[in-house]
């Protein structure tokens, strides 16, 4: 495909449309891109699409947004990639700012509280479903990959029982993968197929489309992109520090979410425990139950699930009154923009600078084995997140009254029903959340919930 074959304005319209219809998490968003770009519009070959997808699966960050950035870059160079990545995120950012405001201002209204109460068990079910789905794909059979199972179990123990820092778990898993790739290479080889590639596996190696000149590795270009990326990080950070000080809420958010962006191997569910640990426990920007509400809002809006960080930023900016008590909305919206900027900036740098570099190492075990181990650790991370959500949903007042007396039975019924709908009924996430919210409203109206 020639890079100029698709009009830039036509591409912009598609990326904006994708930003509004990108429901269903990364799998759904990638499926939409595949259907529209490969099957219908034929803007990109099957081989090139799958090769781009492999790129993004190896990187930290939201793979669907990175895939959009990569394809935009492939079609229209650097500005095409930037436009695709920004338009993929912008609609969900604006929607979440609006919904976060409604949540804070009207969240205590009886019917709104009932809907939010009903959504929480569905969110817990979604995380359990993610655990089953990702665990099944990653760990395979215990006899086939016992070391991966051991890494997943150790990750769970480290996070849930020992409360070790998430970055330490990721680094330890990478080190074990590096060693395991040499000691037991068969166990640390990545799965041969991915969701979209399963039916067309030969396309992964039958890449006959010529590589555009601007995608070939060049050391001077790499240094230029890294320098621009560093400036785009350093200048806003310096401005925040000079304006409000290093210990200010906005500067702290910028630094914290920069670190979070570099640890999102395995998707949003993998980094949420780290976000919870920092945003709820360490900094107090929001409460644990509010974090669950934010995840529900993130699941019901288009765009990457990691956009839940905009909700965290909005609530933190509102609660900390970053622009004073008379400008709560403006300060909260600014915090949401700051958090989003520092969360997604690394993804643009990874694609625009590191894409050719990652492609040159594709299929080499010394590079993929640490990532395979990190993915196994992610299963343990998601298990700890699932237990955290279940504990807060099923025992909202703690266990002081005893296990049975403290149990929220209607919440348990909703959680079981939502889990069955997702796992057995194969229902979509948005439908399950909407129905759970309606059930919560009905139960609250009857006086049986909340």
Question: Could you tell me what each predicted segment is?
Answer:
Residues 1-59, 63, 70-301, 305-450:
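Multi-pass membrane proteins that catalyze or facilitate reactions on polyprenyl-/lipid-phosphate substrates
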């Amino acid at each position: 495909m020639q890079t100029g074959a698709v009009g830039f304005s036509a591409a912009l319209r598609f990326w904006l449309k994708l930003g509004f219809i990108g429901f269903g998490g990364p799998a759904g968003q990638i499926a939409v891109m595949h259907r529209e770009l490969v099957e219908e519009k034929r803007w990109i070959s099957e081989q090139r699409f799958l090769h781009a997808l492999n790129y993004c699966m190896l990187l930290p960050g939201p793979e669907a947004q990175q895939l959009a950035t990569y394809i935009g870059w492939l079609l229209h160079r650097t500005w095409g990639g930037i436009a695709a990545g920004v338009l993929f995120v912008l609609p969900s950012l604006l929607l979440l700012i609006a919904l976060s405001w409604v949540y804070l201002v009207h969240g205590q209204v009886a019917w709104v509280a009932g809907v939010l109460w009903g959504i929480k068990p569905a969110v817990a079910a979604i995380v359990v479903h993610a655990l089953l789905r990702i665990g099944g794909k990653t760990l395979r059979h215990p006899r086939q990959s016992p070391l991966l199972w051991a890494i997943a179990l150790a990750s769970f123990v480290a996070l849930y029982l020992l409360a070790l820092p998430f970055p330490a778990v990721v680094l330890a898993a990478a080190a074990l993968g590096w060693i395991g790739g040499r000691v037991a290479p068969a166990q640390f080889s990545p799965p041969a197929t991915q969701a979209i590639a399963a039916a067309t596996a030969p396309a992964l190696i039958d890449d006959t489309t010529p590589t555009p000149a601007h995608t070939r590795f060049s050391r001077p270009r790499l240094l230029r992109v890294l320098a621009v990326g560093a400036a785009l990080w350093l200048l806003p950070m310096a401005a925040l520090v000079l304006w409000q000080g290093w210990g200010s809420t906005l500067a702290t958010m910028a630094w914290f979410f920069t670190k979070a962006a570099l640890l999102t191997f395995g998707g949003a569910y993998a980094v949420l425990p780290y976000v919870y640990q920092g945003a709820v426990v360490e900094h107090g920007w929001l409460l644990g139950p509010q974090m669950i509400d934010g995840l529900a809002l993130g699941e019901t809006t288009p765009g990457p699930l990691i956009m839940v960080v905009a909700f965290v930023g909005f609530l933190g900016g509102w609660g900390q009154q970053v622009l004073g008590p008379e400008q709560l909305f403006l300060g909260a919206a600014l915090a949401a923009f700051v958090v989003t900027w520092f969360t997604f900036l690394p993804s643009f740098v990874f694609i625009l600078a590191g894409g050719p570099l990652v492609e040159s190492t594709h299929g080499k075990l010394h590079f993929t084995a640490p990532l395979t181990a990190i993915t196994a650790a992610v299963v343990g991370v998601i298990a700890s997140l699932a237990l955290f959500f279940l504990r807060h949903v099923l025992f909202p007042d703690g266990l002081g009254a005893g296990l049975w007396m403290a149990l929220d039975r209607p919440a348990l019924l909703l959680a079981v029903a939502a889990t069955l709908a997702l796992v057995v009924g194969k229902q979509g996430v948005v439908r399950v959340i909407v129905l759970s919210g309606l059930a919560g409203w009905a139960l609250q109206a009857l006086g049986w919930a909340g």
